[in-house]
């Protein structure tokens, strides 16, 4: 797994404890398919920090350590067909041909979604995204 879970945990620790200056978090640039360090400032006056990630409910020990740094973890549930539609559209928007986007979703994203769904019941709250009445998202 190329994700730096230990660095993520260190960032969350700093965001919780450092009050004298901003703490900077990375963003992910989908245009270049790379994280961009220091893109998101968490200001000292911030009292609520929202983070997102597929593995926040993972039973893996490194991810359990991350979960221990969070007050709550919510699972956002979306119907499978809508998730697939959004993922395919996102991959197409960032340069994949339609067939390649569908193949990627089927071989990578959907198996990942199945693993993540297995941890659903460990969430503090399950949010049914469709019930929120929001307009359909781009991704």
Task: For the regions a language model picked out, list residue spans one by one.
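Short, basic, glycine/proline-bearing loop/turn elements
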Residues: 22-23, 48, 97-101
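Small-molecule kinase domains that catalyze NTP-dependent phosphoryl transfer to phosphate-bearing small molecules
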Residues: 61-64, 92-139
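Conserved nucleotide-sensing/catalytic segment adjacent to the nucleotide-binding pocket
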Residues: 1-33
